[in-house]
Amino acid sequence: MGTKAQVERKLLCLFILAILLCSLALGSVTVHSSEPEVRIPENNPVKLSCAYSGFSSPRVEWKFDQGDTTRLVCYNNKITASYEDRVTFLPTGITFKSVTREDTGTYTCMVSEEGGNSYGEVKVKLIVLVPPSKPTVNIPSSATIGNRAVLTCSEQDGSPPSEYTWFKDGIVMPTNPKSTRAFSNSSYVLNPTTGELVFDPLSASDTGEYSCEARNGYGTPMTSNAVRMEAVERNVGVIVAAVLVTLILLGILVFGIWFAYSRGHFDRTKKGTSSKKVIYSQPSARSEGEFKQTSSFLV
């Protein structure tokens, strides 16, 4: 008898729990997207989905984030003026008639209850695919051995942004130079994201023709023109010659000052000394008893 009562109590508890779960499920709201990341070639139509449930009177808004920029695409179930010519609002999402690379970014679907506290949101990432263009490179024609040399590679059109591979004399340069015998004597840092290749320090074996390739997983990878870089020794002769010329010029300057001083071109009169000259002449012989002052002063 006791066992039967315990079973009935357990069944009753399970029934009550099921009712509570059902009521919670009915009262909850959900917002989701069937495709949280969308990749589409440029100039094609695309739909960003946003499904929701649990709202009796839903208010839908869409915003667009790209870096530090935020724009409103849809407000209160209506497309804003800046998008109304090429975007259509649907209860299940928004549709672009044609996308451009500037549309790449994150879109947030925000759903709230009109006059209520219920709220939900979902983010959809849109990547508009654009193949890379031919990259441009900045490579010095010569660089001094032992110094730092920086090579850059970039292209502006690829979406998503391109990654870069460097070549020396047609051979792929690994990210870690010590991993390949061909580059084991080099000391460089290669950044595939920025396209920067830094030699620090540059060695004689780094002389060669350099080019880079840009690829982003869409379209054909593009390769830059090859540019030759010469790793040259520091010109010690020029440095020695410059030092000798400096010493010679300094010697000439010192000699000139000494010569001018010795010739009296500099005033050597001491302060407080009179510049007047006094000439004194002895009296001439005269008769006894006659005396006359003959001193003369010249100014």
UniProtKB/Swiss-Prot annotation:
<feature type="modified residue" description="Phosphoserine">
    <location>
        <position position="284"/>
    </location>
</feature>
<dbReference type="GO" id="GO:0005911">
    <property type="term" value="C:cell-cell junction"/>
</dbReference>
<dbReference type="GO" id="GO:1901731">
    <property type="term" value="P:positive regulation of platelet aggregation"/>
</dbReference>
<keyword id="KW-0675">Receptor</keyword>
<dbReference type="GO" id="GO:0035633">
    <property type="term" value="P:maintenance of blood-brain barrier"/>
</dbReference>
<dbReference type="InterPro" id="IPR042456">
    <property type="entry name" value="F11R"/>
</dbReference>
<dbReference type="GO" id="GO:0008360">
    <property type="term" value="P:regulation of cell shape"/>
</dbReference>
<dbReference type="GO" id="GO:0005178">
    <property type="term" value="F:integrin binding"/>
</dbReference>
<feature type="modified residue" description="Phosphoserine">
    <location>
        <position position="287"/>
    </location>
</feature>
<dbReference type="GO" id="GO:0001618">
    <property type="term" value="F:virus receptor activity"/>
</dbReference>
<dbReference type="GO" id="GO:0001817">
    <property type="term" value="P:regulation of cytokine production"/>
</dbReference>
<feature type="topological domain" description="Extracellular">
    <location>
        <begin position="28"/>
        <end position="238"/>
    </location>
</feature>
<dbReference type="GO" id="GO:0072659">
    <property type="term" value="P:protein localization to plasma membrane"/>
</dbReference>
<dbReference type="InterPro" id="IPR036179">
    <property type="entry name" value="Ig-like_dom_sf"/>
</dbReference>
<feature type="transmembrane region" description="Helical">
    <location>
        <begin position="239"/>
        <end position="259"/>
    </location>
</feature>
<keyword id="KW-0393">Immunoglobulin domain</keyword>
<dbReference type="GO" id="GO:0051493">
    <property type="term" value="P:regulation of cytoskeleton organization"/>
</dbReference>
<feature type="glycosylation site" description="N-linked (GlcNAc...) asparagine">
    <location>
        <position position="185"/>
    </location>
</feature>
<feature type="domain" description="Ig-like V-type 2">
    <location>
        <begin position="135"/>
        <end position="228"/>
    </location>
</feature>
<dbReference type="GO" id="GO:0051497">
    <property type="term" value="P:negative regulation of stress fiber assembly"/>
</dbReference>
<dbReference type="GO" id="GO:0030165">
    <property type="term" value="F:PDZ domain binding"/>
</dbReference>
<feature type="disulfide bond">
    <location>
        <begin position="153"/>
        <end position="212"/>
    </location>
</feature>
<dbReference type="GO" id="GO:0098609">
    <property type="term" value="P:cell-cell adhesion"/>
</dbReference>
<keyword id="KW-0812">Transmembrane</keyword>
<dbReference type="Pfam" id="PF07686">
    <property type="entry name" value="V-set"/>
</dbReference>
<feature type="site" description="(Microbial infection) Cleavage; by H.pylori PqqE">
    <location>
        <begin position="285"/>
        <end position="286"/>
    </location>
</feature>
<keyword id="KW-0796">Tight junction</keyword>
<comment type="function">
    <text>Seems to play a role in epithelial tight junction formation. Appears early in primordial forms of cell junctions and recruits PARD3. The association of the PARD6-PARD3 complex may prevent the interaction of PARD3 with JAM1, thereby preventing tight junction assembly. Plays a role in regulating monocyte transmigration involved in integrity of epithelial barrier. Ligand for integrin alpha-L/beta-2 involved in memory T-cell and neutrophil transmigration. Involved in platelet activation.</text>
</comment>
<dbReference type="GO" id="GO:2000810">
    <property type="term" value="P:regulation of bicellular tight junction assembly"/>
</dbReference>
<dbReference type="GO" id="GO:0032991">
    <property type="term" value="C:protein-containing complex"/>
</dbReference>
<protein>
    <recommendedName>
        <fullName>Junctional adhesion molecule A</fullName>
    </recommendedName>
</protein>
<dbReference type="GO" id="GO:1903142">
    <property type="term" value="P:positive regulation of establishment of endothelial barrier"/>
</dbReference>
<dbReference type="InterPro" id="IPR003598">
    <property type="entry name" value="Ig_sub2"/>
</dbReference>
<dbReference type="InterPro" id="IPR013106">
    <property type="entry name" value="Ig_V-set"/>
</dbReference>
<dbReference type="GO" id="GO:0090559">
    <property type="term" value="P:regulation of membrane permeability"/>
</dbReference>
<feature type="modified residue" description="Phosphoserine">
    <location>
        <position position="281"/>
    </location>
</feature>
<keyword id="KW-0677">Repeat</keyword>
<keyword id="KW-1183">Host cell receptor for virus entry</keyword>
<keyword id="KW-0945">Host-virus interaction</keyword>
<dbReference type="GO" id="GO:0071260">
    <property type="term" value="P:cellular response to mechanical stimulus"/>
</dbReference>
<comment type="subunit">
    <text>Interacts with the ninth PDZ domain of MPDZ. Interacts with the first PDZ domain of PARD3. The association between PARD3 and PARD6B probably disrupts this interaction. Interacts with ITGAL (via I-domain). Interacts with CD151.</text>
</comment>
<dbReference type="GO" id="GO:0035025">
    <property type="term" value="P:positive regulation of Rho protein signal transduction"/>
</dbReference>
